[in-house]
Amino acid sequence: SAAHSSAVRKALEEKGLISREHGVNRCIQINGMEKNTDVPVLGRVAAGYPILAVENIECYVPVPDSLKRGRELFALRVQGESMINAGIFPDDILIVHRTPVAENGEIVVALVGDEATVKRFYKENGHFRLQPENDNFEPIIVDEVALLGKVISLVRYFD
């Protein structure tokens, strides 16, 4: 009923959850909504065997400004199953902080030659180990690796 919806609206206003522009009907603003920045999805990254790295903007995903915090971010769509034990599944969209450095154990997007892959990063005994999170895949051991960035979040859509 109109009386009930008016009472609910008034209660939400009193709690500071919404505000209304007085004198304008049907104008309700939700308070505390964080602003977003659109981050480009630059293509696919292998969670499996490395795939050729090609940057091509597919679309954009909204990322809260509190996650961005002035950092340069990009996104990649996951292809493959090597990171499923870390909760990263095919078609997930990884939000990546572009940086050339990472700590041991962090999940990174790495360039091995001209192929990109997402793995857990370890620097050890004069080489680098890119460790999958799926027992069906072997680690990638290399003497040289270029880090494209650290995975800081992911977006998953349910269809």
What positions do the PLM features span?
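C-terminal regulatory/effector modules of DNA-binding transcriptional regulators
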Residues: 88-159
